[in-house]
C-alpha cells in the first residue's frame, strides 16, 4: 500500500544526481518538498518522451515553484550516473534522486509489473504531511499543476 494525502511523509535517504545524499526529513519545518516519481530515464519509447515532456513543463515554472519555499526532486530507479547524465543532457535545474533499491518508489508511487516507479507526484508540506498526491499526470501541464497545489498550502 502506498502513501496518500494526509499521511505523514515517510523519511528516506537517497543519492542525488549531484552526488549529494538527500534525507527527506532534513527539510521538515524548513521547506515544502515535491517528489516527482517517474519510471526510468532513456527508455526507447513513449515513456522516455513523457519524462522529457514532464521535465519541460516543470522547468517552465521552476522559478515560481522554488519561490514558494519549496525544493523539488525527481525520483526513479535509475543509477546516480544515469540521473546525472539525464540532468546534464536536458539541462534540468533540479536534482534527480536515484532509488535503485526502490525504497521510496514502493512507499510513495508504487511500482509497475516491470519494477519501475509509477508516474506520480507528492507535495509534502513543511510540517511533513502529504498535502497532495497526483497520480493522473498530464505531462505537458504538470509543472503548473504542481505550482497550483503549492499555492493552496497554508504555511
Question: Model features per residue range: what roles?
Answer:
Residues 1-155:
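Chalcogenol-based redox active-site neighborhoods
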Amino acid at each position: 500500500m502506498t502513501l496518500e494525502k494526509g499521511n505523514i511523509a515517510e523519511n528516506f535517504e537517497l543519492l542525488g544526481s549531484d552526488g549529494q545524499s538527500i534525507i527527506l526529513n532534513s527539510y521538515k519545518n524548513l521547506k515544502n518538498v515535491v517528489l516527482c516519481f517517474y519510471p526510468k530515464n532513456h527508455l526507447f519509447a513513449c515513456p522516455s518522451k513523457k519524462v522529457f515532456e514532464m521535465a519541460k513543463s516543470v522547468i517552465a515554472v521552476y522559478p515560481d515553484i522554488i519561490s514558494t519555499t519549496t525544493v523539488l526532486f525527481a525520483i526513479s530507479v535509475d543509477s546516480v550516473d544515469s540521473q546525472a547524465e539525464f540532468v546534464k543532457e536536458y539541462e534540468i535545474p533540479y536534482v534527480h534522486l536515484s532509488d535503485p533499491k526502490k525504497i521510496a518508489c514502493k512507499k510513495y508511487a508504487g511500482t509497475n509489473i516491470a519494477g519501475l516507479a509509477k508516474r506520480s507526484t507528492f507535495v509534502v508540506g513543511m510540517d511533513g504531511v502529504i498535502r497532495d498526491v497526483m497520480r493522473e499526470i498530464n505531462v505537458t501541464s504538470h509543472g503548473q499543476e504542481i505550482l497550483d497545489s503549492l499555492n493552496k498550502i497554508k504555511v
